[in-house]
Curated annotation (Swiss-Prot):
Protein name per Swiss-Prot or TrEMBL: Sodium/potassium-transporting ATPase subunit beta-233
Self-association and partners: The sodium/potassium-transporting ATPase is composed of a catalytic alpha subunit, an auxiliary non-catalytic beta subunit and an additional regulatory subunit.
GO molecular function, one term: P-type sodium:potassium-exchanging transporter activity
GO-annotated biological processes: intracellular potassium ion homeostasis; intracellular sodium ion homeostasis; potassium ion import across plasma membrane; potassium ion transport; sodium ion export across plasma membrane; sodium ion transport
Sugar-modified residues: 193, 263
Protein source organism: Anguilla anguilla (European freshwater eel)
Transmembrane residue ranges: 31-51
Topological domain spans for side Extracellular: 52-302
Parts of the chain on the Cytoplasmic side: 1-30
């Protein structure tokens, strides 16, 4: 028992020694010195860290990407974009395709002419393909840049203005396609027809990035039949590039291409691939949306 009392007294004395006025073996002065040391030490570390970050930020621009040499070519996005990129519906049953047309209507609201009336934010860039629209350097001294208008009506049968079902009720579905944004990227039209499929060569024209859709599987040849393209030059016109970023180009509207499959084989799953072609457009097996996209469409008629 006496041993326990001695040990109890030992650790209690270690915690607080009333004779020496020590807490955990240190006097108040000692504790003050060591705390002061760590405050100064970690304060200096924090100052070095903050200074390094600040120096790095001074080398970066809020408007212009510093390093773009490893940026991949832009991808293609399409609407509707269901899970697994599969569009399946019955043209006689509204509820089977309403979810697709609803998403398309919401997406195209930004392209309503009434949303592009502000002369300080938007400008007309022509209804025919043109060259790049340069609006100065990627700096803030010029201020916010105007955006080219893109009229929804240019998508014609796929605009949703006359046919609010976007062709779905007739078994002729539309897909709206856009080229994803990359700051200061200038897509270059193909400079040679060698890399373009024979059937797609007719779509090559000046100042346009062409897009072409075909069957993915050889056994589906002949089942896709007629495909219509709507938009400026039936592709992506160069006057909508470059994009200056969110801060300098907040109203920017990407040019759209509407693709309508007007004569699909009914009650058959078709896998379709759409590609854009350009000198600085590449493809990747790891990214199925880089410069292209695959989609499965099944139109039921029973």
């Amino acid at each position: 028992m006496s041993g326990n009392k001695d040990s109890d007294g030992g650790w209690k004395t270690f915690i607080w020694n009333s004779e020496k006025k020590e807490l955990l073996g240190r006097t108040g002065c000692s504790w003050f010195k060591i705390l002061l040391f760590y405050v100064i030490f970690y304060g200096c570390l924090a100052a070095v860290f903050v200074g390094t970050i600040q120096a790095l930020l001074l080398t970066l621009s809020n408007y212009k990407p510093t390093h773009q040499d490893r940026v991949a070519p832009p991808g293609l996005s399409h609407t509707p974009c269901p899970e697994k990129a599969e569009i399946t519906f019955n043209k006689h049953e509204l509820e089977t395709y309403m979810k697709y047309t609803k998403g398309m209507k919401e997406f195209l609201e930004l392209y309503d002419e009434t949303a592009q009336l502000d002369q300080l934010k938007y400008e007309d860039c022509g209804e025919n393909p043109g060259g790049y629209k340069n609006r100065g350097d990627l700096e803030s001294d010029i201020g916010v840049r105007k955006a080219c208008r893109f009229k929804r009506s240019w998508l014609k049968d796929c605009s949703g203005l006359e046919d609010r079902t976007f062709g779905f009720k007739d078994g002729k579905p539309c897909v709206i396609v856009k080229l994803n944004r990359i700051v200061n990227f200038r897509p270059k039209p193909p400079n040679s027809n060698e890399s373009i499929p024979e059937d797609a060569k007719a779509k090559v024209r000046p100042n346009v990035i062409p897009i072409y859709c075909t069957n993915k599987k050889e056994e589906d040849a002949g089942k896709l039949q007629e495909v219509k393209y709507f938009g400026i030059g039936d592709g992506f016109p160069l006057q909508y590039y470059p994009y200056y970023g969110k801060l300098l180009h907040p109203q920017y509207l990407q040019p759209l291409v509407a693709i309508q499959f007007t004569n699909l084989t009914m009650n058959t799953e078709l896998r379709i691939e759409c590609r854009i072609y350009g000198e600085n457009i590449g493809y990747s097996e790891k990214d199925r949306y880089q410069g292209r996209f695959d989609i499965k469409i099944t139109v039921n008629d029973s």
